[in-house]
């Protein structure tokens, strides 16, 4: 129901290549620590999503929040601050209804800031709809997409394959 793309700041390639150089994309796909290095890496990440079928923002955010809370509880990073940040996340999606096509974007900074944006077309909005300052919640959003219990195994495969190609100088 959702198309997802993950974009990494250009300095991600040398940062990741230092540790993962020489691995095949198949090895990377099955290496959780590779994805955890992406999630916690000292570079910006942009997650671009687009709905394929109509969906209420509240329904979408409920599932994302459930996955994030479950992950944070499993790794011991869920507390009062995270509960408050999750509520702010829910609030940002409350009045959003996704038609097929328009974008939602997550901007993740290395210092734990999660910016949320919504676009009625394919442009990136200049102003974010919400900013959540909580490193555990920010990391959990991407963790649920490419981590241990990923909602998108294809995204993991594509990410590993493209990073490997870029490392070898192949433009994708």
From Swiss-Prot:
Keywords: Flavonoid biosynthesis, Isomerase. It comes from the Eukaryota. Induction: Induced during a hypersensitive response (HR) mediated by P.syringae glycinea. Substrate binds at residues 2, 67, 144. The record marks 60 as: Important for catalytic activity. The keyword Secreted does not apply. GO terms for molecular function: chalcone isomerase activity. Its EC number is 5.5.1.6. One of its GO terms (biological process) is flavonoid biosynthetic process. It catalyses: a chalcone = a flavanone. Pathway: Secondary metabolite biosynthesis; flavonoid biosynthesis. It is an enzyme of class 5 (isomerase). InterPro entries: CFI (IPR044164), Chalcone_isomerase (IPR016087), Chalcone_isomerase_3-sand (IPR016088), Chalcone_isomerase_bundle_sf (IPR016089), Chalcone_isomerase_sf (IPR036298). Catalyzes the intramolecular cyclization of bicyclic chalcones into tricyclic (S)-flavanones. Responsible for the isomerization of 4,2',4',6'-tetrahydroxychalcone (also termed chalcone) into naringenin. Part of the biosynthetic pathway for all classes of flavonoids, a large class of secondary plant metabolites, many of which are brightly colored. Belongs to the chalcone isomerase family. This is Chalcone--flavanone isomerase 1. It comes from Glycine max. The lineage of its organism: Eukaryota, Viridiplantae, Streptophyta, Embryophyta, Tracheophyta.
